[in-house]
Amino acid sequence: MKKVSPILRILGIVLCFLIPFNIISQDNSNIEKEIFNKINNYRVKIGKSKFIFNDSLVKSCRSHSNSMGINYKLEHVKNLSEVGANAEIIQLNYTTGRTFIETSDDVLDIFLDSPSHKKIIEGIYNQISIGVFVTKDEDLWVTIRFK
C-alpha cells in the first residue's frame, strides 16, 4: 500500500470541508432567485408590475438572515432607513428534505397568509432585495426588503 503524504491528507480534509459550503452558498442564491420569481409571478397574476431586483441591499439582507439564524431569533431591523429600505418582511421556514422550489412556494404562501406581509408584497414598492440563510439543521431564514 502506498503512503499518502501528510500534505495531501490535509489538502483532502480541507477540500471535504470547502465543497459543502460552496454548494450551500449556491443553493442559497437559487432559493433567493426562486423566491423573487414566485413573488413577481404572483404580482403579475394580481395585475401589479414586477419588482426590480435591488442588488445593493442583498448583502444586508443576507447578513440579517444569517444573524437571525445564528441567534435563532426572528427580529426586524429597528431603523430601516439605516439599511436603505422602506419595508421589511422576515420568516423562518423549516426545509428538511425539500427542494428550493418547494421551499420558495412555502415562503410565498406563508407571507401571503399574513395580511400585513401580503399588503407589503402587493403594495406601492417597486424594488426588492432578498437574502436567505440556511442553518446546518436546514432551517431557512429569509429577509426581504422593499424600496
Name the predicted role of every residue range.
Residues 23-147:
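Functional surface patches built around histidine and acidic residues
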